[in-house]
Amino acid sequence: MSLLKDSTVAVITGTSSNLGFNIAVRLLEGLPDNKEITLVVTSRTLPKVKEVISDIKKYIVEKIPTKVNKVEFDYLLVDFTDMVSILSAYYELNKRYKHIDYLFINAAQGVYGGIDWTGAVLEVLQSPIEAVTNPTYKLQKVGVESGDKLGLVFQANVFGPYYFIHRIKHLLKNGGKIVWISSLMSSPKYLSFNDLQLLRSPASYEGSKRLVDLMHFGTYNKLEREYGIKQYLVHPGIFTSFSFFQYLNVFTYYGMLFLFYLARFLGSPYHNISGYIAANAPVAAALGQTKQNCKTASACTRSGKEYLLEEEIDSTGSDDVVSYLDTLTKEWDEKLKDQIVNTRQP
């Protein structure tokens, strides 16, 4: 239970990422100064939790000192590729809180194997803007399963968070808001309905984001009608993400940044580059500034001035996706019915 009486409770998955950190600080900036806030930081490991809490505290002191005594921190250790870990996170939230106001589904995972450098050079030479907007040279492993025998990327990015929401719906009921972070690269071409767990897909990350889009359109009306929960779909555009740095050296990193700025200069609205600008749409959605029946993107002008873009999504197949997820949910309810674990164990 929060020590701050009647505080606003926000759970941000993947808080230790660049986007997760910026969602946290922008949410704190966007909420009224008289609001007491409990920020529930999540990560897979305790060191990352400690690091991001320290970083957020430093930001509060330097940028929003009016919030210094208004913010309390809590944490969850949760791995969305592990159903027992998800169940454990549910138990902990259920013990500590009566209501959750904001839930950001930002945790995302890919199974990258590196970069096709020959393909990357050719793409950049042929179409530099397309090469840094919809790249095809990121190599992804095919057929990777989790320990639960589910498609790993499917479980991490789609089913794991979906099951988590299923478990904590009663905490979000009557006013809670869910914000799903999708991607610019979530075209229908990345998903086969014969491979919903993405085990045969060479673009499983993008396919998982297409599934997120379809899941949203198949569930947001029911969530609001039956539970009073508002769900939103957003994407952060293109920004510098920590997850891919391991494949870049100093030259390729700055080369990438140069192409990002070039794309923005030539008119791309999606090359936000800054994680802070990328977090605009997620936080705007949480604060009720976007619509539920579209996908809202973080965007910016050539000079870096931020704004929001509304995008229409082809929702064909959304009912089939939700039906599949609900069937899996029932199966895992049965498998986990006698399982009790401790999320505080690092």
From Swiss-Prot:
Pathway noted in the entry: Steroid biosynthesis; zymosterol biosynthesis; zymosterol from lanosterol: step 5/6
Active-site residues annotated for this sequence: S182 (proton donor), Y205 (proton donor), K209 (lowers pka of active site tyr)
CDD domains: 3KS_SDR_c (cd08941)
Single Gene Ontology MF annotation: 3-beta-hydroxysteroid 3-dehydrogenase (NADP+) activity
Keyword Disulfide bond: no
Primary residence: endoplasmic reticulum
Locations listed in the record: Endoplasmic reticulum membrane; Lipid droplet
Membrane-related topology note: Single-pass membrane protein
Glycosylation sites: N272
E.C. code: 1.1.1.270
Induction (free text): Expression is increased by itraconazole (which targets the lanosterol demethylase CYP51/ERG11) and by zaragozic acid A (which targets the squalene synthase ERG9).
Summary of the knockout phenotype: Leads to complete loss of both 3-keto reductase and oxidosqualene cyclase (performed by ERG7) activities, compromising all sterol synthesis.
Catalytic activity: 3-dehydro-4alpha-methylzymosterol + NADPH + H(+) = 4alpha-methylzymosterol + NADP(+)
Residue stretches spanning the membrane: 242-262
One GO CC term, this protein: mitochondrial outer membrane
Family matches, as Pfam families: adh_short
GO terms, biological process: ergosterol biosynthetic process
Entry-linked SUPFAM superfamilies: NAD(P)-binding Rossmann-fold domains
Keywords: Endoplasmic reticulum, Glycoprotein, Lipid biosynthesis, Lipid droplet, Lipid metabolism, Membrane, NADP, Oxidoreductase, Steroid biosynthesis, Transmembrane, Transmembrane helix
Family: Belongs to the short-chain dehydrogenases/reductases (SDR) family. ERG27 subfamily.
Protein task: 3-keto-steroid reductase; part of the third module of ergosterol biosynthesis pathway that includes the late steps of the pathway. The third module or late pathway involves the ergosterol synthesis itself through consecutive reactions that mainly occur in the endoplasmic reticulum (ER) membrane. Firstly, the squalene synthase ERG9 catalyzes the condensation of 2 farnesyl pyrophosphate moieties to form squalene, which is the precursor of all steroids.
Subunit structure: Heterotetramer of ERG25, ERG26, ERG27 and ERG28. ERG28 acts as a scaffold to tether ERG27 and other 4,4-demethylation-related enzymes, forming a demethylation enzyme complex, in the endoplasmic reticulum. Interacts with ERG25 and ERG28. Also interacts with ERG7, but only in lipid particles.
Name used for this protein in its record: 3-keto-steroid reductase ERG27
